[in-house]
């Protein structure tokens, strides 16, 4: 019987590999030196009638993607089952989360690292524009208070899911007009709030360089031409990257408001192409890929002295090597902790490497 059981176990493993063979590990995007933000439409997440057919596998894969990417803030679209939403939060205890309260099944949500932010409030906005916002998929507004440095700051996030481009030619034109009007109303809402440090995340369901509707300009042209806003995803549109598994356009975007646009690290945005890492990604995870961007923030740990001495004082008597990185993750210098001292004022990430291979990181500000 033991031989039979071993054979059955072998068959189970074999068929498991055939169904969902491993391709590679989802890459880490997050960094200790940057604020890492993303947006992802998780296609009918948890819904038994739509989207991926195996909700358990979808939950597993979505958990893996979020864990491995290690973003600080993530906007989500199409959360469609409260039970699976609760399971996802249980799988990711490092994140706090809020979800919209509108009645549509496909809901928007925001996840944020609890070590970095405290929730101030969340609410749906622009409730007078039900039709424009895909018949009730109102923008989710979330205010988070930063938990780093000597001074607290408030960051605002808006998660949106605009009208999809489906149906006949005339229906697609109608959907285009609804996306354009919804974007206009959201911009009207945000324009007076130039002092707010904010980001708009989500499935915009159209591209930035030109519309996915043949012969039409991007419905977000007024945003793109306004210097008070920057789209980290615009460079991806120009590079002809795509944010879905089935189509060739970028329809998932991130937009940064005036008070935060200078924090975007130029050229540090991208798409996590899911089917490069998860087999049958389109069938068992989502029809969209996560889109991400990196920002330089004031992650200050005030040392209050002219050198980094307090930061390495703890290593006295313990042989180690010190690596010094800038905010973009570039190695600036390395060597003995007592001789490696950045002279320029600024923020640094120090990493101590011990003989046993262990590493410890600390952020310091030199002034």
Where are these regions (language model features)?
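Metal-dependent phosphoester-hydrolase catalytic domains
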Residues: 25-27, 82, 123, 134-136, ...
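N-terminal, active-site-proximal structural segment of metallo-dependent hydrolase catalytic domains
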Residues: 23-94, 102-106, 183-184, 278-281, ...
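Structured beta-strand-rich core segments of catalytic domains in phosphoester-bond hydrolases
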Residues: 73, 79-162
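Bacterial Sec-dependent N-terminal signal peptides
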Residues: 1-26
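Second-shell loop/turn segments in exported
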Residues: 46-53, 71-78, 127-131, 168-177, ...
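Coil residues (strongly favoring Ser/Thr
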Residues: 33-34, 48, 154, 210, ...
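Active-site beta-strand/loop signature of hydrolases that rely on acidic residues for catalysis
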Residues: 37-42, 62-85, 111, 142, ...
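C-terminal outer-membrane/trafficking sorting elements
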Residues: 304-367
């Amino acid at each position: 019987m033991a031989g039979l059981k071993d054979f059955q176990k072998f068959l189970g493993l074999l068929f498991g590999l055939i169904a969902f063979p491993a391709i590679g590990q989802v890459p880490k995007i997050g960094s200790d030196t940057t604020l890492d933000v993303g947006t992802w439409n998780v296609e009918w997440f948890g819904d038994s009638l739509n989207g991926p057919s195996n909700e358990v596998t979808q939950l597993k894969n979505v958990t893996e993607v979020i864990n491995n990417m290690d973003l600080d803030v993530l906007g989500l679209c199409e959360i469609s089952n409260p039970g699976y939403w609760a399971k996802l939060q249980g799988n990711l205890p490092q994140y706090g989360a809020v979800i919209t309260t509108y009645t549509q099944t496909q809901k928007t949500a925001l996840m944020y690292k609890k070590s970095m932010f405290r929730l101030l409030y969340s609410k749906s906005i622009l409730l007078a524009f039900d039709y424009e916002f895909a018949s009730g998929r109102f923008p989710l507004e979330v205010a988070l208070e930063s938990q780093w440095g000597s001074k607290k700051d408030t960051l605002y996030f808006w998660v949106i899911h605009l009208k999809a481009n489906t149906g006949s030619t005339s229906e697609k034109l109608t959907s285009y007009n609804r996306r354009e009007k919804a974007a206009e109303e959201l911009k009207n809402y945000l324009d007076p709030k130039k002092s707010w440090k904010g980001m708009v995340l989500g499935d915009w369901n159209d591209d930035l360089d030109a519309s996915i509707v043949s012969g039409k300009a991007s419905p977000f042209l007024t945003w793109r031409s306004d210097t008070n806003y920057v789209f980290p995803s615009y460079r991806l549109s120009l590079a002809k990257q795509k944010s879905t598994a089935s189509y060739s356009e970028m329809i998932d975007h991130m937009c940064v408001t005036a008070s935060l646009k200078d924090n975007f690290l130029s050229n540090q945005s991208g798409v996590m192409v899911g089917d490069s890492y998860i087999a049958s990604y389109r069938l068992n995870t989502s029809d969209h890929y996560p889109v991400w961007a990196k920002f330089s923030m004031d992650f200050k740990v005030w040392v209050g002295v002219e050198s980094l001495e307090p930061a390495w004082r703890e290593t006295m008597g313990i042989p180690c090597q010190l690596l010094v990185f800038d905010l973009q993750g570039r190695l600036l210098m390395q060597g003995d902790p007592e001789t490696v001292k950045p002279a320029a004022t600024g923020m640094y990430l120090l990493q101590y490497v011990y003989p046993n291979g262990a590493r410890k990181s600390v952020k310091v500000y030199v002034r």
